[in-house]
Design a protein with these regions (language model features):
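Surface-exposed, proline-enriched loop/turn segments that connect beta strands in immunoglobulin-like
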Residues: 23-26, 243-245, 434, 444-446, ...
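Ser/Thr/Pro-rich low-complexity tracts
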Residues: 16-142, 218-229, 233-322, 327-331, ...
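Short proline/glycine- and polar residue-rich coil/turn motifs
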Residues: 63-69, 80, 195-197, 207-208, ...
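Extracellular/luminal low-complexity segments enriched in Ser/Thr/Pro
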Residues: 73-81, 268-272, 459-463, 467, ...
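Short beta-strand and strand-turn-strand segments in soluble, beta-rich domains
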Residues: 55-56, 386, 476-484, 599-609, ...
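Bacterial N-terminal signal peptides
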Residues: 3-13
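Short, solvent-exposed loop/turn segments enriched in Ser/Thr/Gly
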Residues: 31-37, 82-87, 148, 252-255, ...
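Acidic, Ser/Thr/Pro-rich low-complexity intrinsically disordered segments
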Residues: 17-61, 66-70, 79, 90-93, ...
Length: 813
């Protein structure tokens, strides 16, 4: 009895899946300190570890909170932890959470003043602000119609900077506004949006006189929300808004010039790493947020003014040959920069602008001309996916010199309108990524959680650029006890199924794994790229996201059911169907309905969106059908199931094995000749066959899509059948009209399994109204005998008088 009770208790703990982590509080902490944090959400049962995407933070004292809605921990932040956003996930015994963020800063934290019940602010008027010191980070909330005021003391000539992390905290579309006010409540500096910080803001000013200054924080339209958290940095730190040059070569030592700070340009020498990174300006203290720097092996030139026309295009001498890059700034009003380069005939070049992608406000427009003829060759405004950076593919028509110009779409300019133009050959590239599972939830199924002793199929999507190739898919760093099976990817496939299978004794653990695709012929490789969209809004686009080449992969606690797939050992033929049998093996105590989908289908093969194994059942049939042009081939298919855990404790997701499915050539084709009849008049439908492959024995033929009141019995055919007449019975009330959807299902049996062909689509049966019955000829009726009354005889008309008689008569009178 005790053992049974222990089993039931342990099994009940299994029925809690997909931990839902919503926020980590506080939203950040100071480097070199320990911070007690709370993970809040739902179904946070039995926390195991925090998965960090960047180094610099360690965890101790990870423990469950008072219920499944919270987890407590202590973050130990290293003194050399990178400033800014740190991405992480919480792994519980039964799953891995969505990615959430924690921000590391350089200053100690201050909490916004609240009443004892934490319901109201104590800093919502200019007259009664919250007093703070410089070089602190305030953790606050911008409520609806809320304005938060913080007062700080400053000296004349001192730099006072403020920067806010709001939207970038990744909860909602928060648009903060910040201002620095003097004692008379006049704004001496303010900012709403900035290209560098997206919808977050920052401003900096040289203090005009000693005294108290007030910092105002609010939502720009006063549309606050209890989830509009912010981190407000206040201090004497530098706050430049741009850096030049914006790029360099790997390992190169260059001098960066940070501009936009009120004290003037800040110069800083730096050795560039091997890949793109972000640089902090340091002047006493550091900028809270860094500025992006691109790293590329391309040779580059920094612009030299004047270069505002094709004749003045830079450089005038020693023209660089493509590939090359140019750096510049559209600094003056209406500025247009021109550059010269040398091209060779038939070079396939891609001209790519980096502006918004390196957080410049520039909305670029580029045009390319031949220096010899001064004729325009091509131009472009927005082409880069996700940002309004220009991109232009250009085939050099002949050897010679060419000029390219760049300007802002609206003619804007400024010291922060920095750009980089890369002119380089179009190189082939490949990569893979997990496609979004839901339009408004970019994180759904973006982690790979495999129940112990079970399986999961994921379907990466392939991106090929300037190459068509087959691919091999490999991994590095999977958890112990987890095996991956991936097919060889044909060049015509843009998606493919990958099976992960966890051993029954696999340790519950996780890793940040990397995956690679490789063209076995050329040796070209590409990464598995992932973009987590923290804040995105339908057609408005993505406001804050995180890009990574690491995927969270975990072995989690065992699931209460498993899935098996049976694929008949016969081919699926074009215009045919095949039934897949899906069996669920349920553990005692679990009997929830199970929704089953086929996550990947071979080309030309279709299936229902989903099928369901209802409560009390353990089997379901999923029917595949093939288009007429489905390519012949051998494929691997599997199915994935989702079910709600008992007591609604999350979603369970797992898959079957991958099983071989053959799409083969059809055995025959047929055409249905048009037939016509009348209601109540039986007739025949003639089908003529085109035998493509011999088959053994007899096949069954069934005529489908007959109208109401019309039936046809199944028929038998053989491999040598050329034509068949199918008797049809037509009732008196059969639907009249032209019925043009008839088709025949021909079922051939092979090794006891059916091979269904659906053929002759568009066959026509016309049921005409019966002709009207001929009218009977009526016999003429005999007229009734009527006795006529004798009418008085009329006097005969008088004979007209002749002229002579008329004269005689007149004379007599």
């Amino acid at each position: 009895m005790k053992s049974l009770l222990c089993f039931l208790l342990s099994f009940s703990s299994l029925l809690a899946f997909s931990p839902d982590l919503r926020v980590i509080v506080p939203r950040g902490g100071q480097k070199g300190t320990e911070v007690k944090v709370t993970f809040s959400g739902d179904r946070l049962f039995e926390p195991q570890e925090v998965i960090f995407y960047q180094p610099g933070i360690a965890v101790k004292d990870l423990a469950k909170g008072k219920d499944q809605r919270s987890v407590k921990a202590t973050f130990v932040i290293s003194p050399d932890a990178a400033l800014g956003e740190h991405s992480m996930r919480l792994r519980c015994k039964d799953g891995v959470s969505y990615m959430r963020t924690f921000w590391v800063g350089q200053f100690p934290s201050v909490i916004e003043a609240k009443t004892e019940d934490r319901k109201n602010d104590l800093n919502d008027t200019f007259e009664a602000p919250q007093e703070i010191s410089q070089n602190v980070t305030v953790h606050g909330v911008a409520l609806r119609e809320d304005a938060d005021y913080y007062r700080v003391q400053a000296k004349k000539g001192q730099r006072l900077s403020v920067e806010i992390e709001g939207l970038r905290l990744g909860r909602l579309l928060f648009d903060p506004y910040v201002a620095i006010l003097d004692k008379n409540r006049f704004e001496i500096a303010s900012n709403d949006d900035s290209a560098l910080l997206k919808r977050d803001c920052a401003t900096s000013v040289i203090i005009p006189e000693d005294g108290a200054y007030t910092i105002l924080v609010r939502e720009s339209a006063y549309e606050g929300d209890p989830r509009f958290d912010y981190r407000l940095h206040v201090g004497d730190f530098p706050r430049p808004m741009s850096v030049f040059p914006p790029a360099g070569k790997p390992g190169e030592k260059i001098e960066l010039t940070f501009t936009g700070d009120p004290t003037g340009p800040i110069k800083q020498a730096i050795t560039l790493p091997a890949s793109d990174f972000s640089a902090h300006a340091v002047s006493g203290t550091s900028t809270p947020s860094a500025l992006p720097i691109r790293v590329s092996p391309l040779a580059y030139l920094n612009e030299v003014e004047p270069n505002e026309s094709s004749k003045a295009a830079f450089p005038k001498e020693n023209l660089p040959a493509a590939p090359v890059a140019f750096h510049g700034i559209l600094a003056t009003e209406g500025d247009v920069d021109w550059f010269r380069f040398e091209g060779k005939k038939d070079q396939n070049l891609r001209i790519q602008v980096f502006a918004r992608s390196i957080r410049s406000p520039l909305d670029s427009v580029i045009a390319i001309r031949s220096l010899k003829t001064n004729k325009a060759i091509a131009n472009n405004d927005d082409q880069t996916q996700g940002v309004p950076d220009s991109r232009l593919d250009f085939k050099v028509p002949e050897d010679g010199h060419y000029v390219i110009n760049i300007k802002d779409q609206l003619g804007r300019s400024g010291p922060d309108f920095v750009y980089r133009i890369e002119i380089a050959p179009r190189e082939p590239a490949i990569s893979v990524a997990l496609r979004p599972a839901e339009r408004n939830d970019s994180q759904k199924y973006k982690m790979i959680s495999v129940p112990r002793g079970n399986r999961l199929i994921v379907v990466p999507g392939v991106t090929r650029s300037s190459i068509g190739c087959e691919l091999d898919f490999t991994h590095a760093g999977l958890p112990a006890g987890l095996k991956m099976t991936a097919p060889h990817v044909a060049k015509n496939l843009n998606e493919f199924p990958v099976l992960f299978e966890a051993a029954t004794d696999a340790p519950l653990a996780s890793t940040l794994a990397t995956f690679t695709v490789k063209d076995p012929k050329s040796g070209l490789t590409g990464p598995f790229k992932e973009t987590i969209e923290h804040v995105a809004l339908n057609n408005l686009g993505v406001f804050h996201s995180y890009d990574t080449e690491k995927i969270a992969v975990a072995v989690i606690d065992e699931a209460p059911f498993s899935l098996d797939l049976f694929v008949p050992p016969v081919p699926l033929v074009p215009k045919g169907t095949i039934d897949l049998k899906i069996t669920a093996t349920k553990k005692e105590g679990f009997d929830e309905k199970i929704r089953v989908i086929i996550p990947w289908k071979p080309p030309g093969v279709n299936a229902p969106n989903s099928v369901e194994i209802p409560k009390g059942k353990n089997e379901v049939i999923l029917t595949l059908n093939a288009n007429g042009d489905a390519p012949v081939g051998d494929w691997m298919v599997g199915v994935t199931a989702t079910a709600e855990a008992k007591d609604k404790l999350g979603e369970i997701r797992l898959s079957s094995q991958l099983k071989p499915l053959k799409v083969g050539e059809p055995f025959l084709d047929l055409a249905i000749e048009m037939a016509a009849t009348n209601p109540g008049k039986n007739t025949q439908v003639i089908a003529k066959f085109d035998q493509l492959k011999p088959f053994k024995g007899e096949a069954q033929l069934i005529l489908h899509a007959l109208p109401h009141g019309v039936t046809a019995a199944p028929m038998k055919i053989k491999a040598d059948t050329k034509e068949i007449s199918i008797p049809i019975t037509v009732a008196d009330d059969a639907s009249k009209g032209k019925h043009a959807n008839l088709f025949c299902q021909v079922i051939i049996s092979e090794n006891g399994h059916p091979i269904a062909h659906n053929l002759g689509h568009g066959g026509t049966l016309r049921i005409d109204p019966p002709p009207p019955a001929p009218k009977k000829k009526e016999e003429p009726k005999k007229p009734a005998q009527v006795v006529k009354k004798e009418e008085p005889k009329k006097a005969a008309p008088k004979k007209p008088l002749s002229r002579l008689e008329q004269l005689r008569q007149n004379k007599a009178q």
